[in-house]
Amino acid sequence: MIVLKIGGSEGINYDFIVDDVAGLVKAGQPLIVVHGGSALTNRVAEQLGHPPKFVTSVSGFSSRRTDRRTLEIFEMVYCGQVNKGLVEKLQTRGVNAVGLSGLDGRIWEGPRKDT
């Protein structure tokens, strides 16, 4: 089993990645794709009048501050546009892909960070 993480920064060519994924799947390789979408999320948040906010820890690590509205924007972009876009691209290449989010079946959960 291969777990492939596709980043979400600007400039990613999803068509090239999906071509490779389709080739692996058709060759019999079990595969899970995990994707990002931060660049698109930032753009959509700006368009909706809710620009991203970041906090920096004492050690210098920067994280996105996620309030309820930001979480809704994340859900719209990650679960909607990015996830279903990748599923569509895989389907057109003959891969019977299924798109899930961490909310589906509580696939993953994590503790909330203190800020």
Predicted feature descriptions by range:
Residues 1-115:
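Nucleotide/pyrophosphate-binding catalytic subdomain
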